[in-house]
Amino acid sequence: MAKEGYYVIRTWEAGDIGEKTKFFVPGKKPDGIPSRRQKNAIRKQEQNEYSALKMLARLIHANFTAKDLLLGLDYSDEGLERVLSWGRKNGLPVDSTDETLRNDAIREAAAHELDIALRRVKRELDKSGLELKGIYVTSDMDGVTGEIVRVHHHLIVNAGTEEAFLKCWEKFGLGGVSWEHLWENQIDRTRLAEYLLEQVRRVPDAKKYRSTRNLVRPIHKDRIVSTDNELMVPKGGKLIFRQEYENKMGLQSDFQNRRPQYIRYITPKALRRMEAEREKGA
């Protein structure tokens, strides 16, 4: 027997990318504004929407384009010693014989050094009236092999900031700075978000990534429906990815069909803009 319930279609728009997810919520369908209990029921079913990967990808889509930069900050021997010295002075076990404790402490000290460098960069950019926008991760792991490597940082930052990073990192003797523009032909930057998170070793209670406060934070819209019809891309949009939403509850017979209930697409307005740009450049 099917359990009483309803479906929620959650829509996100971040930059040129849209997403829709449809999930089942047990209980009586709201007549108007959902009650607190109904909101809590929705919240329990939406956990997959708040995965670090999806949230990071949305943040990238909403704030950065192909003109912006993927930037790397490495530590020289001198720069690493500076990190270790700060860690020792502040009681972090950077010299511990326990490898996990030592690596966690070094990563924490390096994150502190990055914070100092970012403040320098912001002051430098203030001179030219440019604001720093960025997302950054601190890594001590090879994302492919999983091996521990020298601590370093990966950042996505706005265009025009590379010289400030050179001045505030390399010229301070901390190490090297490298950068490249975000891939112009990659409208969907979910793979870039995956790449960044692959570099981050899991540490209890530690954030996987951080960002500047001035970024646009995408906000979702919810719509309640009664049926489990297949999600469709908005008219004029272009499908990028479709996957099945798995019913872990096993209580709604229709829902056990596990129809594709997550889609990611290029929004119609983005495609119209791209077409106008092509016509203008022709």
For every predicted segment, state its role.
Residues 152:
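Conserved, short, structured surface segments that act as functional micro-motifs
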Residues 1-149, 159-282:
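Right-hand nucleic-acid polymerase module
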